Amino acid sequence: MKNTKPKVRLWSVLTGLTAILTVAAIVGNIIANQYATTINVALNASTYKIIHGENTGDTEYFKKGFASDEEREAYEAELCATVEAEGAALLKNENNALPLASGAKVSLFGHGSVDLMYGGTGSGSVDTSKAPNLKQALEAQGITINQTLWDLYSSDSMMSKYSRMTPASISDTLEANTQYAVNEAPWSALSSAESSFAEYGDAAIVVLSRSGGEGADLPSGENGTSDSWISGQEGDGNYLALSAEEVELLQNLKALKDNGTFKNIIVLINSSNAIELDFLNPEICGEDYGIDAAMWIGDVGQTGINGVGQLLSGAVTPSGSLVDTYLYDNMANPAMYNFYTQAYPNAAEYNLLTEGADVQGMYSVYQEGIYLGYRYFETRYEDVVMGTAKAGDYNWATTVAYPFGYGDSYTTFAYSNFNVTESDDAFTVTLKVTNTGKTFSGKETVQIYFQSPYTAYDKANGIEKAAAELCGFAKTDVLAPGASEDVTITVPKSELRTYDANNAKTYIVDAGDYYFTAATDSHNAVNNILAAKGYTVENTNGRMTENGNTDLVWKWTNDTLDTTTFSTGANGTAITNLFDESDPNKSSDAPGSVTWMSRSDWTGTIPTAPAQLTANETLAASLAFTKYDGSEANSVEMPTLGAKNGLTLASMIGKDFDDPEWDTLLDQLTYSEMVNTITLGFHNTAAAASIGKTATKDENGPQGLTAALTGGASAMCYTSEDVMAATFNVDLINEVGRCIGEDCLAMGYSGLYGPGINMHRTAYCGRNFEYYSEDPFVAGTICAAEVQGIQSKGVYVYLKHVALNDSETSRRGVNTWLNEQTAREIYLEVADKAITDGGAWSVMTGFNRWGATWCGANANLLTGFLRGELGMRGMCITDFSGSSQYMDLVDGLIAGSDIWDSPTPKIHTTKAANYENDAYIVTQMRNAMHHILYTVVNSNAMNGWASTDTLKTITPWWQTAIYALIAVLAVLTILCAWQLSKAIKAKKSMVDTAPAADQK
């Protein structure tokens, strides 16, 4: 028989290959285990199983409100459309352009017409791949669309060449701004469809869309942005101005309107970032584009465009009101001069560099103070009208296109029987609202504003006052022509307080005259108050834009300065200065002095360039990643760990936060359980077997439940938050919240990263779609209603981002400087209302620093303000912290942070290993676990759990699969190596016996 040649080469290759695969699997397993938390969340992989004990009670603590997923989804689709229909604001409507006549035939223009902005980008983005488009929404209302033009805009060639461009990733740098592009199609690209225009000439509807997103602020043209990038051909680098192609489009449509091809031109503003509206006013822009109607629709969410269709067709009458001041030129906003971050000019001298996700040498100054949005535009207007010294050269009418609160209707309304009564702790405003139109039914938003006196005491102590502040609102039911409704609005006296940071160092109520008025918008409110003071258009030489209505004004006089009524917070906590270290004029870090904008000297204090600060040794030391030096390690007794007390987390259902039994439960925790829960909190809270704690799933976001980062289940995408606020409808947004809670309950989520509560400081913040407004009152009131709805289904919210994350540029560590009055009255007010009125459980802190102190390590913010003054009992989670060293574990724990939004043990888990014997830090961990567990035990995570149930740790299936793969590959490697060894021996044997064979 012929001998078979040994297969040495084959077995060598197979042995090498299986060995490489084995090593790769082992390395992959190591890497996967570092991201086990993220993988478990993404794959919905359990790390435990429940061992049920005896129980006869109902453990479904939070019940679903829908019989099926289909019922829930259908209801929410209608709800989203309703929010859009009540939130969109009609800005202009001439020549009866709107509503469209029944059966109208229209042409849709602009790339945005086929590619709407449904929401922003980043962690709050949602899947809208199945969302209806504008064509479908209009056709559902009996409107016929120019199919030829639609097909052209939506063709592959047009979509690839002229699509809107946005930043490709979350980068947080100024350079990301240059990735935004309008990229509108030039008029010449539409020539093939021009012959179809006349047949669909009832209206030319132009959609102007602008995108925003996480990690990238919008370019204003003031930051070196390439002109050519913004428009596709030419422009001024301002993303919120019309591009050259958009101007060309409007010019050509005007020509076609003039020759009779189109009857009307209608513009839809599809953006949560306020576009400059000079093009709507020929006297401002110098050219008449023939625009008959304009409507702001924001970001429409998954089905909100159906609401737009209802508005355009007249099925619903517009009732939304703007929640931002819209300008002709956005640079008229004083905050713009300090919006984009600055570098300390001597940062390198102190090694304050940006390394990876740690920004050390960048800062931003809120130099405008409380004068955000209408608080500036209307206050300076009042001072100009009254002839106040140093008011300067300011013309409201050429600055403001549409004021905060503005919203037109297809009908008209009248207010009468205005009355205000005072009680011990509130003012009650009543009035009658009548639909005075003859054709359309509709709702009306009633807005109540007040004015606080700007006194000599204020001027002496650096207190600023706005000419008007929103303090109450209500929305009527649908009123038929001629119908009326009596409206009652309660204004708590706490709305009148102002913060005195320099003398009383608490909230005060000034002595003097206070004015209350019912108004249609902020400008109307100031004119009413001016009228009550005796000012008219005539006696101010036209400085007043229109006469106010004194019948809608009521004056209340406070006889003496009150420094005590509002000087205490929750549980009697004294309210006093907490944020001096964020004020460069008071901070021990002394980066320099800042002149705050003041109405006592508009001309001398309005910024004309960014505020200049410099670094020093003290500031550099305050910016160190870790300040704790271990000196407190033995200052407290080491907490008990790993006790066998027999309690489970479910046994704490219904127990008060201060119940002594919590200590017994906390004694059972192990150090590793605390570290795992605290340092690996990316979209979850971890299971803890010692107390029978289940793992929970947390997810974004501001427009509804989305799993953009983890790949899990998503649900209804509602409108952007500004559209929600623009409804001015508390009950409607409470229902949105309830349905978001239903989505979470149906899909197994217990926590929601949202709502977003930062401010629209300027129009250029990338995440304005996630935030409600420039005004903290409407933002806080609407947020509180949404929070109540969400949490009614056992879903704890994380209000984000507390606080001052009002821009994206350099956000990972930027030093934010502001004074205390501004912090409290503007930037913390939404959280205040959401927690005290809405009962919000938890917060997510910002990436940014307050002065030199990271939000999550700011004890005055977390422990002093949130837990002390507001009485918050839930948890404080960081923003994403997996790659940032400045978001320090020990400093954060000491300040009051509880859980780090990190998917990897690389930084914080590793650091925790150094503190197992530090009693002080272990105590802080125990306190953090108390906050976490108290939140979870009051959530839907406890559905199905009884006090007798326990938990057993198991290996998740994907880890078992990897271990099995490694084992199989290892066995194959051994077998291949064995076969290789045999082959080598056989080959050697053949070589050794070859001569003998030859001799035969």
Question: Predicted segments — roles?
Answer:
Residues 493-566:
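Terminal connector regions
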